[in-house]
């Protein structure tokens, strides 16, 4: 969607250390990104940097932009473009800053701000995983199409976004799709994010290996798991597997509401061959009744798209046919419920960029 659109949207990768400014047209980045220090501890300098960065991008364009759209860390009132609250990486915003209205007043074009989980999911739903799966199904001769998607980002935190039939679920308070504060399977009094994040991987590796090296990064732990670096290989693998299990528990709860495909991105997704099997296994878990009867925790069969055999099973299913009573008319009967879990093909940054572009254009059309 929007691949052939000629409108230009300015966008921003808002990090606590640097801002990276760019412009998108037809789902593609059309300028060399402009990188500037974010000056996040000084509001006046930070706002001046935002203006300078967008000005630099605008000067390189042959057509004026129609909007500005980007992800920015919360807490925030995204609908009204106000950023405020406990933002560790943007301390100067804690009292509340009308960032969207500030930029809109300065440039005279609409400004749309969302969280990265939402824009990741939106990008994957419109231009990534969702259309890819539907193309694969069509190629196999199936007329079924998926319309719903749960996007998950694994990194500093446990991010998520939900798209229902091409519409982003933001909720009445801008909290739609959040999973980070779901109950933690292993530590029920804690947030799920405490076991699904960079800090979780580091903590679990320390606990299992007994190595109290605060400088170890998830990349180091991954390389230990791969045998590239010395260390406790079993503990390294287990640290990613535990993250997958804990993420799966929270995702299962979300899927009972969303019922759609799951796509995973973010910095930790590089360890997906350790994370996904544990995650999918958790989605296939069972729950019991007092009578002893067992039920799957999800009504849908779950397939790991990254596993070749699983992917073939997901794509290779046959509809049954049933007769309308009293007639010879046959109708297709879809007696199987199934979803797939996969990794982002383009990566989180690209999907967030495309999500920001699509979100701006969709809002302009409202």
Where are these regions (language model features)?
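Short glycine-rich, Thr/Ser-proximal phosphate-binding strand/loop in the N-terminal lobe
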Residues: 2-52, 56-63, 82-86, 173-188
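Short glycine-aspartate micro-motif
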Residues: 9-13, 65-69, 149-153, 263
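Short beta-strand scaffold segments in enzyme catalytic cores
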Residues: 19-24, 151-153, 158-163
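Adenine-nucleotide phosphate-binding core of ATP-dependent small-molecule kinases
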Residues: 35, 39-66, 188, 202-275, ...
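Glycine-rich phosphate-binding loop and adjoining helix at the ATP-binding site
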Residues: 39, 44, 48, 64, ...
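Glycine-rich phosphate-binding loop plus the immediately following alpha-helix
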Residues: 113-117, 129, 171-219, 361-365
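Glycine-rich phosphate-binding/hydrolytic loop that grips phosphoryl groups
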Residues: 114-127, 274, 281-366
